[in-house]
Regions:
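N-terminal capping/small domains of soluble enzymes
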Residues: 1-231
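Glycine/Thr-rich beta-alpha phosphate-binding loop at enzyme active sites
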Residues: 22-37, 242, 246-342, 377-395
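Catalytic cores of alpha/beta
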Residues: 63-68, 225, 352-370
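Glycine-rich phosphate-binding active-site loops on the catalytic face of alpha/beta enzymes
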Residues: 75-87, 240-242, 359-389, 691
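Ferredoxin-type iron-sulfur electron-transfer modules and their immediate structural context
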Residues: 317, 323, 328, 374-375, ...
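Rossmann-like dinucleotide/flavin-binding elements
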Residues: 540-561, 602-611, 625-633, 645-700, ...
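Rossmann-like dinucleotide-binding cores of NAD(P)H-dependent redox enzymes
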Residues: 559-562, 566-601, 674-721
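A conserved short coil-to-beta-strand element within the FAD-binding core of flavoproteins
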Residues: 602-616, 631, 716-726, 732-735
Length: 983
């Protein structure tokens, strides 16, 4: 496929809009239109109905982008920058992919990739279309929006024929062929509006934002702005770079907020506009604008240049935006506001989004333009929520900025969840699967769960208050809802698409709500299953894996006995994990679910040997012993293994520790041990780890809980010896990454001491190898469903994997049960578990933090009902939804609209690139020849060229060998969506 996008002819563009709106009530995939309320804000002698719009960038480069943004609520359009370098010359300088917006944003775009006259035509097309659409569809006043030019990068280029003509034609488009064509097409489409159309103003733009390259001298910036004010008579904003803050300020802010991995040096700070030069220049330009009766202000801010060091994007430098840029930009606003006593107008771009937009507007900072937030799932749809939030505030002409409020905003941003980077690197959001060509909607949470729980379905049931059905659905795959609803590692939440909005849906908490509210009804409905003949199972180990296996077997009709050496079932969660993590009462309820099915439980003595069990008639035996042996630290001194020590502590009823306790390790068990030590009276509790907290295997939440309770953390330390109330440690540093991807700790040769009377070794747990050996089981040798080398003996959970999570143990238990029973468990999902497509679509673009677990289904995006992340995140609208007659939504990639920015790749839940891997609609033979994508080209009549496994020309009126789903999709495109390719 080609990275070159090309404009859609205006008649085709309008045909698309009119057809889609009439059929779906949508425009370019934006689901919900914004209808203006009548409130307006004056600016540049014009009015805007909302203070928002797309910043100069990918969301304002094509007519369809601008129209989509307007439909969602944008009314101020900073159209993409033009300069003397354009078209193919510029495109060759932009590597692909060029956008990375999965978290904080990065890009390598500059100005428009179109030729300047093409860009001009796109803006004129959008201007004319919006004049009519606003009136015909009742979206707002035809005079309720403003187009703001962005030009760069030097005065010579701006005064050159190419850019100068662009400026003149944007100021008055009446003599351009494009403006005349637009009026003719619109009159043809809306003849009843011919008089209105004839009166559309050709003054597309009366204002400009000056964009300069890094290192541009202050004298050049002033010359450009002065020229635009005096020679062109344009209201003018000057865009400033974050480098004006100074290297030390920028580095300190970003480091303190977790962005210490972002690399940049001082050269841009030294070469860019300096504060001492900027202030008097802005004063002169303000005075010049005032003398001409024009408005002047500052655009804060430009993106921030940083180094590419982790293969984020191709090349060596990229430009940072989004949530990490906000604290820098708002600090710039604070300094400017104070310097000019609130009288300098500020146009904002630099991490604005739903959670801060109202505060910006209330402080007098507007217009507010956005890019990164609308490059994420929800896309342009996010604008409506921002508009609705600020509509509640008073609208009035600019009368100054509130310096105190802006200063408070700046300070607060340093600790704001929405701008802080998590301590640990973000987990992978994608699955390992490739995206299907069709029928690709999937719930990534479900794929991230080892037992593939029906998460969206039970979330919906809980949202509806159907707790009994929700718990029944949960226990079809998970017989430990209380345990997993409390301490599950919840990898599902790492995959949740809501992470791209605000925060993951609280899936684990919702499961616990279902368990607590649906338990009675479920217990009342359960009864033993009729027994299968000839099968009798013994389970050695009564921890989570053993309990789960017994549940699955008994449900399937297998006579089952579980053997546990301790007095009660529950394993490590009951005897080791502290009560503040999981209560005995919760465990008892999970055990009761299993017992309800008729499982025989034998506790308080070691299990018989495998041979003895076979002689007792057991046909299938499962080794489900937990990892009870602590890893050996191997240093001299007073050292205890974490498992035995925590078991001992759990038996204590009051604080019993004295002195200083050091826990060596960095997993969740280490966090638990450190918290236990603190709660049991230790003078101090310290975690010692040979790497840094970023490399810790522990959940970030568990680390935070430990630190909040007063546990100390010593990083880059390896214990050597404990003696005389001290722990001697080697000072470590991080070297090259090891096989796990974490950087290896390397000793520096220096040592130090910390107070320590007792060392707890929490460096990993092991299974009792002696028990395995006594039964002839060879560790590590596994067959189907984890069968061991001993006939009819299986292993699961810790005994199979080494230290495993509870849910991994459940997955093993399910596989074992299926092998014994001989078939997979089947069940039905209630109809009430499926939301309507319209309800799922209505959630797109809505940001909302968690409030209560019972309401989390309302935040669930129902990705398996409607995903469309690639549709939302494409600024050019190159991924479109095709709705089949049977109600399915299919994604089709429209090749001509794509410039391979790569943004859709970041948000596809599969290990795939929608722009390359989804079924593609081609415009020309040349386009198809330059691409390897699977897709179709309509050749006229019934003839098509289609590429799947082979590339062929077919006649749709004749029998063919196309897969039925593909043929249906092609016929639907031709029948209902021909506007995608006809010109």
């Amino acid at each position: 496929m080609s990275e070159k996008m090309y404009p859609i002819p205006f008649k085709s563009l309008m045909n698309w809009i009119v057809t889609e709106y009439a059929r779906e009530g949508e425009i370019f995939g934006v689901h919900t239109p914004y209808y203006a309320t009548g409130k307006t804000l004056p600016i540049f002698g014009e009015t805007i109905e909302t203070p928002f719009g797309p910043a100069a960038g990918p969301n304002s480069q094509l007519a369809q982008n601008i129209i989509a943004a307007y439909f969602a609520g944008a009314r101020f359009f900073e159209v993409k920058t033009v300069q003397k370098m354009d078209g193919e010359e510029l495109a060759r300088c932009v590597p692909r992919p060029c956008i990375l917006a999965a978290d904080e944003g990065y890009n390598q775009e500059w100005s428009t990739e179109l030729e300047v006259p093409q860009a001009q035509n796109e803006y004129i097309k959008a201007w004319c279309a919006l004049k009519v659409l606003s009136k015909v569809y009742g979206l707002g006043s035809p005079d309720g929006f403003v187009f703001n030019m962005s030009v760069g990068y030097d005065l010579e280029g701006i005064k050159g024929e190419k850019v100068n003509s662009y400026i003149d034609n944007m100021m008055d488009a009446s003599n351009t062929a494009q403006f005349k064509e637009c009026l003719a097409v619109l009159t043809e489409l809306f003849p009843e509006e011919k008089d209105f159309i004839a009166g559309i103003s050709p003054r597309v733009s009366r204002s400009v934002t000056v964009s300069t390259l890094h290192g541009c001298p202050p004298q050049e910036i002033e010359r450009i702005a002065s020229y635009l004010l005096t020679e062109k008579g344009l209201h003018t904003f000057v865009k400033c770079n974050p480098t004006i803050l100074g290297y030390k300020t920028a580095r300190t802010i970003l480091d303190s907020m977790g962005y210490d991995y972002i690399v940049f040096d001082e050269h841009h700070f030294n070469e860019d506009l300096q504060w001492a030069d900027a202030v008097p220049m802005f004063e002169r330009l303000q005075a010049l604008a005032d003398s001409r009766g024009l408005e002047f202000g500052l655009k804060l801010s430009n993106t921030f240049p940083v180094d590419t060091t982790r293969n984020e994007l191709p090349g060596t430098e990229m430009y940072m935006s989004g949530r990490s840029l906000f604290p820098l930009t708002i600090e710039m606003c604070s300094r400017i506001s104070r310097q000019f006593n609130g009288k300098m107008r500020i146009s904002f771009a630099g991490g604005a989004e739903f959670f801060n937009c109202d505060k910006l507007f209330a402080a007098g900072i507007w217009p507010i333009t956005v890019a990164t937030t609308i490059l994420k799932p929800g896309g342009y749809n996010r604008l409506a929520q921002m508009v609705e939030k600020t509509e509640k505030l008073p609208y009035h002409a600019f009368n100054g900025t509130d310096s105190a409020a802006i200063s408070d905003m700046s300070a607060a941003s340093h600790s704001d969840f929405h701008h802080l980077k998590p301590i640990k690197p973000l987990p992978a959001r994608k699955s390992e699967d490739k995206v299907p060509l069709i029928d690709c909607f999937t719930a990534p949470c479900k794929g991230g769960c080892p037992i593939h729980q029906d998460i969206p379905e039970y979330m919906e049931l809980v949202r509806r208050g159907l707790y009994g059905p929700a718990l029944k659905l949960i226990t079809e795959k998970n017989p430990l809802p209380f345990l997993t609803g409390t301490i599950c590692a919840h990898r599902c939440q790492n995959k949740c698409s809501r992470n791209f909005y605000d925060e993951s849906v609280h899936i684990r908490d919702t499961k616990l709500v279902a368990a607590e509210h649906g338990y009675g009804a479920l217990m009342a409905s359960m009864k033993p299953t009729a027994k299968l003949p000839g099968k009798k199972a013994a389970i050695i180990g009564g921890g989570p894996t053993g309990i789960a296996a017994a549940y699955f077997l008994a449900r399937g009709g297998v006579e089952t006995t579980i053997f546990e050496r301790e007095a009660k079932l529950g394993g490590v969660p009951r005897y080791v994990i502290p009560a503040f993590r999981i209560s005995d009462e919760a465990l008892d309820k999970d055990v009761a679910l299993m017992e309800r099915l008729g499982v025989e439980v034998k506790c308080g003595a070691p299990a018989p040997s495998v041979e003895a069990l076979k002689k007792l008639g057991y046909t299938h035996i499962l080794m489900a012993t937990g990892a009870w042996q602590a890893g050996e630290l191997g240093i001299p001194g007073t050292v205890k293994g974490v498992i035995g020590w925590m078991k001992e502590m759990k038996q204590q009823v009051k604080p019993c520790l004295e002195g200083h306790v050091v826990v060596v390790g960095a997993g969740n068990t280490a966090m638990d041990a450190a918290r236990v030590a603190k709660r049991m009276g230790a003078a101090s509790s310290t975690i010692v780890y040979r790497r840094t907290k970023k490399e810790m295997p522990a959940d970030e939440h568990e680390l935070k809980l430990a630190i909040d309770e007063g546990v100390k953390l010593v990083e880059l330390a390896a214990p050597v010896e404990q003696k005389d109330g001290k722990l001697v440690c080697n000072q470590m540093k991080l070297g090259e990454p090891d096989a796990s991807g974490r950087r290896s700790p390397v000793a520096t040769g220096e040592t130090f001491e910390i107070p320590c009377d007792l060392v707890i070794s929490a460096i990993g747990e092991k299974v009792d190898a002696k028990l395995m050996a006594e039964n002839g089981i060879e560790m590590g040798r596994k067959g189907p469903a984890f069968q061991t080398n001993v006939e009819n003996v299986w292993s699961a959970g810790d005994a199979h994997r080494g230290p495993a999570t509870v849910v991994e143990g459940i997955a093993d238990a399910a596989a074992f049960a299926e092998a014994v029973i001989g078939k997979a468990h089947t069940y039905e999902i209630p109809e009430q578990a499926y939301p309507a497509k319209a309800d799922a679509i209505a959630k797109k673009g809505i940001l909302k933090m968690a409030s209560c677990a019972c309401c989390e289904g309302g935040r669930c995006l129902d990705c398996n009902t409607v995903c469309e992340n690639c549709v939302d995140s494409c600024p050019n609208r190159a991924n479109v939804v095709v709705k089949l007659a049977d109600g399915r939504h299919e994604i089709v990639h429209v090749d001509k609209m794509c410039n391979e920015c790569g943004n859709c790749t970041q948000f596809c839940p599969y290990a795939s690139e929608p722009c390359h891997d989804k079924f593609t609609l081609f415009q020309t033979e040349k386009d198809m020849n330059e691409s390897e994508n699977r897709g179709v080209l309509f050749l006229g009549g019934d003839k098509i060229r289609v590429r799947l496994e082979k590339d062929e020309v077919l006649d749709l009126s004749q029998p063919n060998e196309l897969p039925q789903d593909i043929e249906t999709l092609i016929l639907t495109i031709r029948g209902k969506y021909s506007y995608l390719y006809t010109e």
